[in-house]
Each structure stands twice: as C-alpha cells, then as structure tokens.
Swiss-Prot record:
It comes from Lawsonia intracellularis (strain PHE/MN1-00). The keyword Cell inner membrane does not apply. Mg(2+) binds at residues 102, 244, 246, 248. Gene3D superfamilies: Alpha-D-Glucose-1,6-Bisphosphate, subunit A, domain 3 (3.40.120.10), Alpha-D-phosphohexomutase, C-terminal domain (3.30.310.50). InterPro entries: A-D-PHexomutase_a/b/a-I, A-D-PHexomutase_a/b/a-I/II/III, A-D-PHexomutase_a/b/a-II, A-D-PHexomutase_a/b/a-III, A-D-PHexomutase_C, A-D-PHexomutase_C_sf, A-D-PHexomutase_CS, Alpha-D-phosphohexomutase_SF. Signal peptide: none annotated. The gene is glmM. Disulfide bonds: none annotated. This is Phosphoglucosamine mutase. Activated by phosphorylation. The lineage of its organism: Bacteria, Pseudomonadati, Thermodesulfobacteriota, Desulfovibrionia, Desulfovibrionales. Binds 1 Mg(2+) ion per subunit. The active site is at residue 102. Its cofactor is Mg(2+).
Amino acid sequence: MGKKLFGTDGLRGRVNIYPMTPEVALRLGLAAGTYYRRKSHRSRVVIGKDTRISGYIFENALTAGLLASGMDVFLVGPLPTPAVSFLTANMRADFGVVISASHNPFYDNGIKLFDADGFKIPDKAEHKISEMILDQSHTWDYPDPSSVGRAHKIKDALGRYIVYLKNTFPSTLSLEGLRIVLDCANGANYKVAPLALEELGAELIKIGTDPNGLNINHQCGSLFPEYVAKKVIEMRADIGLALDGDADRLIVVDEKGIILNGDQIMALCAQDLMRQNKLPGNILVATVMSNMALEVFMKEKKGALIRSNVGDRYVMEAMRKHGAMFGGEQSGHLIFREYSNTGDGLLAALQILRIMKQYERPLSSLAGLLQLFPQRLINVNVKQKRPIETMPTLLKTIQRIETAFSGRGRVLLRYSGTEPLCRVMVEGESDSKVNTYAEELADIVAKSLAE
C-alpha cells in the first residue's frame, strides 16, 4: 500500500484499483469506527452515497468494518454530500461517511468523512485513520459479540433534508413564476432538488434526473453547463442550475444563456449579505484560484478577500479561523455558514433564487458585478509530482512572467489532490499575454514531468 491515502477530498480513485478496493474500505470502516467509537454511549455513524453502481460495494464493505468495530450504522441511501453533513449533526451521530467521487466519471469512486458537527474531518484525524489502515500488523480492538453494531435504513432522510433546505428560504417568498432549467448530473440530487424546488413553486425543465449507475456526470452536470445554457435559451427560462454528482457544487446560467462561475456568484451573494449586515467584517473567503477581480471588488466594498488552499474543506477552515460567514471556490463550491458547514449546491441555488425574487430583477442584471481578468487554466497530465521549487527552468520562467505583469497579474501552479494533474493558471489584463504565458508554462511542465 502507498503511504498517502487521503487526498484533498478524502479517498478517491478508480474502482477495484487501490485504494478504491473493498479491502481498503473494510479496513477504513474498522479504523474510523475504532477512532470515533465512544465508551460513554452507543456510537453511531451516518452513511450516504451518490448514484454510482460501485456504491453498493463500498457501502457494504464500510458497513461491515463499522459494525465489527461496534458502531451502529444509519444508511440514508443516495443523497447529496451536504445532506450527509446535515444529517450527521441532526441525528447526533459521531461521524458521517459519503461514498462519492463528486464530478468524476462512474468508474471512479471515493470516500470522505465528516465529524459530529458536519465538518470534514481534520488532517490529524485522517492521519490517525490512515495509520491504522496502512499498518497491516495492526491489531483491531474488536468488541464483545454482544456489543457489535446494528445497521438501520433511514427512510425519512430525504424528507428531513428537504425540510431543512426549505427553511433556508423565506416563508414570505415563493418560486412561482420562475422557470428553471435544472441539471442534477444523474447524481445524488436527482430526487431532492426537483422535489424541493417544485414544492417552493418553481416550474422545472429537468436534465440528468434518471440515473442508471453508469451515467453520473456523463455529458451533464456542472462540468457540462453548456447543455443547460442551450436549454435556457430554447425554453426561455429565467435561470439554469447545474449540479455535480454529489451536489456540493453549483454552476449557474443566466436568462441569456451566459455561464457564470463561482467568483461571479460569490460577488453577488457577498454583496447581498453585506446589505443585510450578515457578512462580519465584510470578509469573504475564496481560494488561490479565484479571479483577481473578486479581490478588487471586495476592496471597493471596504471588505477583504482571504485566500485559502484549494478545496472546500480549506475554505471552511479559513472561514472558522477568521470568523467569516461566507466563502467558496471558483469551481462552484459555496458555503453559507449560517446554514451549513460544507458546500451545498442546492442551498446555494436557493440563496440566488431568493435574491432574484427579492430584487425582482433578472439574473443577468444582478450578476454583472465583476469585470473578470482574463484567466487561462491548463490541466497538464503528469506522471510524477515533483516539488515546483526543484525545477529551476520553471521557476525562472515564472519569475520572468511575474516581473512582466508588474503586480497586475498572477501565476499559480498546483498539483491536483485527486488526479494526476498539474494545474497551470495565469491571470492578467491582456488575453494574448495570458494565453502565451500559460501555454509556455504548460509546455515546460509537460516536458519536465512526463516521466
């Protein structure tokens, strides 16, 4: 086994190839159960999953390990990642588990853990659990046969989550009169999102609500918002909403078919929260990938943009550290801390719809707050992940480009925490310069890390 199990968002990989094997899942159940089991009470864990066919494999393997460790297991079935975060706290569980590979294709899967308050578990807990999994000589502290866990299917989990979501939307408003194109990516939100939005009065045009175990994220969802954009124009809809496979991220399309990224939505929501005095210190947390225009926008509003590492768990860590109530990622993870401890695509959609209803204005006129700096992101496939500082040619090129920008541009290189990729991002005021520099850097990265 390799030394590192957990990436930036838990375990993830191709099904039946290490680490995404039944054996690892079983040991993970034993390890997590051992770590979180409490002698003071009957310990319990909530397990949810998305719609991948392989979910059955890992659900059963994890359950076996958890039961053997003495944990009671509450199975909620296919539900969004943020629903499991909510239910873990709501049901007073000791921790929660989500089986999902988010926006990845069906042949991948993953496992991520939440603590008792619905936060993604910290690095320290991941490290301890990893140690137990990787140590093949580890002796498990099995409980007495009379103290092993019991498994329960929770039939009202979906209803509990819908009630919670609807309570984040003002009771004085409804979605009547709004035509919404909704793409659920054939993923975890295929039931919840249509039910919640229709109960609030919306007219829906649905895409990606017929999962078969193999079609999750397949030419649908947040990675393919152009399909939603096309449908918005065709159906003359007011807005398009594209979720990913586990429904923790959201991409929005306005009534003109223009695709809005997370930075533009963060500006809209941050301004709304500032108007309500619900953004303490006017602090917004975003990642190193967010556009410089968002930084400029917050300064103009006498606020501050605090940048974190990539990953909604790191956004939340920065939010907790700085007392921020709102944060997110350019990729569409949005965290409204008043309501949730993790990114929630549908909850974010409800906040945007509320703003549209309250101001009685089309989304295009509300979301045009940012003049985005030209930005180019190139994902380079790599066979190794050498530290950037050990590649002198690359470092010299970065230094030359940053000097040329004179403080009006940025260069960012980072390895994906879940895929064999190096992400090369260049941002500046000139489209042509940004593209030239990005391609130059990507070429150096490709040549340096191809073997």
